[in-house]
Amino acid sequence: MFVHSVYFWLKPDLTEEQRAKFWEGVRSLTTIESVRQGFAGSPASTDRPIIDRSYSCALIMIFDDYAEHQAYQVHPIHDKFREECATFWSKVLIYDAVN
């Protein structure tokens, strides 16, 4: 199993239209064939000192293996998302894990 976790910090001055386009784009990533399971969401309302809720969107993708992740990275839907939405975030952090 290969888990790809992506955290986006959206720019504060985005219009509602730009935010909607971002969310539509990020959710489209979960439809890519090599994704076993995908989730895109906002920070939960949990409130403990150890929890970082500063991000705007968490994208969690589960793949069967690294090869499936690599197929996702070069998929046209992924390329379209980057092309159309990369200017919407000020910061992105990615954490990949395997077991």
Language model features with spans:
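Conserved short beta-strand edge segments in small beta-sheet-based binding/regulatory domains
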Residues: 35-40, 84-96
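Short S/T/G/P-rich N-terminal loop/turn motif that feeds into the first structured element of a domain
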Residues: 1-56, 64-71, 98-99
